[in-house]
Amino acid sequence: MLPRITITIMSWMLLSCLMLLSQVQGEVAKKDAPSSRSSCPKGSRAYGSYCYALFSVSKNWYDADMACQKRPSGHLVSVLSGAEASFLSSMIKSSGNSGQYVWIGLHDPTLGYEPNRGGWEWSNADVMNYINWETNPSSSSGNHCGTLSRASGFLKWRENYCNLELPYVCKFKA
C-alpha cells in the first residue's frame, strides 16, 4: 500500500491534469462552434456553420466542383432542407444573376442506369433526405448534373447537361 502523502500528491497531479484537459477541450470546442458571419470570406454569406459563395464565371459542372474543392471542405452546394433552399434562392436573386440555371452539387454518376432516379447524389456525399425536383429527371435525357432554375425562383432542382457552362454555388466550412 502507498503512503498517504504519495496518494495525496498523485491525487493533486491527477486533478491538475484533468483541469488542464478540460481547458484544452473547451478551446477546441469553441473553434468547432457554428461560424459567425464575419468568419466567411468577403463575397460569401454564412448560413449555419457553412459559407456560401455564388460564382458568376461560368464553368461546366466538373470544373465548378473542382473549383469549390479548393476551399476548406468545399464542394458545389448540397441543399439539405427547405430552409437552406430559401436561403440560397435569396442569395442568388439578390446577386443580380441573370442566368436561367446555377450549378449545385447534385449529379447522377450512374448516368441514369439506376432505376427510379436512385443514382442521384451530392458531390460531397451528404445524405439525400430532402428532395425538391422541379420536374422528375429522365434516365434517357443525357442530363446527369443538377441545377437550381430561375423558373422556380432558384428553389427547385432541374437536371442539365454536365458540360454546360453555368454560374455555380460553393458551400464550404468557415
Curated annotation (Swiss-Prot):
Annotated localization: Secreted; Cytoplasm
Disulfide linkage: 40-51, 68-170, 145-162
Gene Ontology cellular component terms for the protein in this record: collagen-containing extracellular matrix; extracellular space; secretory granule
Signal peptide: 1-26
Induction: Up-regulated in Paneth cells by intestinal microbiota (at protein level). MyD88-mediated signals are essential for its induction in intestinal epithelial cells. Induction in the lung is dependent on IL6ST-induced STAT3 signaling. IL17A and IL33 induces its expression in primary keratinocytes and skin wounds. IL22 induces its expression in lung epithelial cells. Feeding with a fermentable fiber-enriched inulin diet increases expression in intestine. Expressed by nociceptors in response to LPS.
Domain of life, per lineage: Eukaryota
One of the Pfam families matching this protein, by short name: Lectin_C
Annotated ranges, domain C-type lectin: 47-171
Phenotypic effect of disruption: Mutant mice are born at normal Mendelian ratios. They appear healthy and show no signs of enteropathy, but exhibit marked increase in the number of mucosa-associated bacteria, predominantly Gram-positive, relative to cohoused wild-type littermates in distal small intestine. Nociceptor-specific deficient mice exhibit high mortality rates in response to endotoxin accompanied by increased kynurenine pathway and impaired ATP production in the brain.
Keyword Isomerase attached: no
Modification after translation: Proteolytic processing by trypsin removes an inhibitory N-terminal propeptide and is essential for peptidoglycan binding and antibacterial activity.
InterPro entries for this protein: C-type_lectin-like, C-type_lectin-like/link_sf, C-type_lectin/snaclec_domain, CTDL_fold
Entry's Gene Ontology BP terms: acute-phase response; antimicrobial humoral immune response mediated by antimicrobial peptide; defense response to Gram-negative bacterium; defense response to Gram-positive bacterium; MyD88-dependent toll-like receptor signaling pathway; negative regulation of inflammatory response; negative regulation of inflammatory response to wounding; negative regulation of keratinocyte differentiation
Region Sufficient to activate EXTL3: start-end pairs: 103-118
PROSITE patterns in the cross-refs: C_TYPE_LECTIN_2
Keywords: Acute phase, Antimicrobial, Cytoplasm, Disulfide bond, Inflammatory response, Lectin, Metal-binding, Secreted, Signal, Zinc
Residues where Zn(2+) binds: 107, 121, 144
Molecular function via GO: hormone activity; metal ion binding; oligosaccharide binding; peptidoglycan binding
Chain positions listed as propeptide in the UniProt record: 27-37
Segments carrying motif EPN: 114-116
Gene3D superfamilies the record matches: Mannose-Binding Protein A, subunit A
Domain writeup: The EPN motif is essential for recognition of the peptidoglycan carbohydrate backbone and for efficient bacterial killing with Glu-114 playing a key role in peptidoglycan binding and bactericidal activity.
Function per UniProt: Bactericidal C-type lectin which acts exclusively against Gram-positive bacteria and mediates bacterial killing by binding to surface-exposed carbohydrate moieties of peptidoglycan. Restricts bacterial colonization of the intestinal epithelial surface and consequently limits activation of adaptive immune responses by the microbiota. Acts as a hormone in response to different stimuli like anti-inflammatory signals, such as IL17A, or gut microbiome. Is secreted by different cell types to activate its receptor EXTL3 and induce cell specific signaling pathways. Induced by IL17A in keratinocytes, regulates keratinocyte proliferation and differentiation after skin injury. In parallel, inhibits skin inflammation through the inhibition of inflammatory cytokines such as IL6 and TNF. Induced by IL22 in lung epithelial cells, inhibits cytokine production and regulates allergic airway inflammation.
Protein name: Regenerating islet-derived protein 3-gamma
Taxonomic classification: Eukaryota, Metazoa, Chordata, Craniata, Vertebrata
Protein's gene: Reg3g
